[in-house]
From Swiss-Prot:
Residues 274-285 have a biased composition (Polar residues). Belongs to the universal ribosomal protein uS2 family. This is Small ribosomal subunit protein uS2A. Its main location: cytoplasm. The gene is rps001. Residues 265-292 are annotated as: Disordered. The keyword Endoplasmic reticulum does not apply.
Length: 292
């Protein structure tokens, strides 16, 4: 994907293209806005337009270089009214230092200085020109440049840089924001191009809150089951009893000798006889000494 007038180091790798294809970033819509025709590769038989990923990467690199020129990262405002972009813009802001507006865009954020949420950004990046039309409109009033993720049916009014991509899919939105954040860090010099980024694209993907709750409940249930198993093992160890047939039994030979009256010297009775015998022997030794 070598492009004229652009260093080879800025070109997309095979891994980048595979990720874009896997996330369906090339899948457009059936409607086509006339100014988006330059970014369309072809039209399928079912009417869906396919975007040119080469131009997608070209505009993504251009947008990253523009964002990197802003001295104060907080002067870059990333906006996403679309639900699938909420987590993506928050992660983008966390990694690049930008200001995120996730959710409903309050009218007057860029124009009404009396409002508590008033901001004066130098650049804004939006997820969808249709869903974020209010932010683009206010940016045009105060001459703020706009970068937008644009589908084939997106309106390009007041959009300065359009990144052609699928801006309706959960994975496609998250991946474009991920690649944009990574490219911004690389252009700034914060991240080396030779070393992979330790952040996974999945971190930028939207997750259903109910799904998160179910996963947390499953983790809690697993932890409770493991703790209960440990308690049961401890109780079983405390109540452990020897049930072997040899436990507590008497050697048959010893029992037979005892019942037959064969008392050895190691028994208590034998010890008593041994004492008596010892005393007699001692007296005999004394008599023998006197006789001598």
């Amino acid at each position: 994907m070598a492009q004229v007038g652009r260093p080879n180091i800025l070109n997309a790798t095979d891994e980048d293209i595979k990720q874009l294809l896997a996330a369906n970033c090339h899948i457009g819509s059936k409607n086509l806005e006339v100014r988006m025709d330059n970014y369309v590769w072809k039209r399928r038989s079912d009417g869906v337009h396919i975007l040119n990923l080469g131009k997608t990467w070209e505009k993504l690199v251009l947008a990253a270089r523009v964002i990197a020129t802003i001295e104060n990262p907080a002067d870059v405002c990333v906006v996403s009214t679309r639900t699938y972009g909420h987590r993506a813009v928050l992660k983008f802001a966390a990694h690049t230092g930008a200001t995120a507006i996730a959710g409903r865009f309050t009218p007057g954020n860029f124009t009404n200085y009396i409002t508590r949420t008033y901001r004066e950004p130098r650049l804004i990046v939006v997820t969808d020109p249709r869903a974020d039309a209010q932010a683009i409109k206010e940016a045009s009033f105060v001459n703020i440049p706009v970068i937008a993720l644009c589908d084939t049916d997106s309106i390009l009014n007041h959009v300065d840089i359009a990144i052609p991509t699928n801006n309706k899919g959960r994975k496609s939105i998250g991946l474009i924001w991920y690649l944009l954040a990574r490219e911004v860090l690389r252009v700034r010099g914060t991240l080396s191009r030779s070393a992979p980024w330790d952040v996974m694209p999945d971190l930028y993907f939207y997750r259903d809150p109910e799904e998160v709750e179910r996963e947390e409940e499953a983790k809690k249930a697993a932890a409770a089951a493991a703790e209960e198993a440990q308690v049961e093992e401890a109780v079983a160890a405390a109540e452990f009893e020897i049930t072997d047939s040899a436990a507590g039994s008497v050697d048959p030979n010893v029992l037979a000798a005892a019942t037959a009256g064969q008392v050895g010297e190691n028994t208590w009775e034998g010890a008593g006889d041994w004492n008596t015998t010892g005393a007699a022997q001692t007296s005999d030794w004394t008599a023998a000494a006197e006789a001598q």
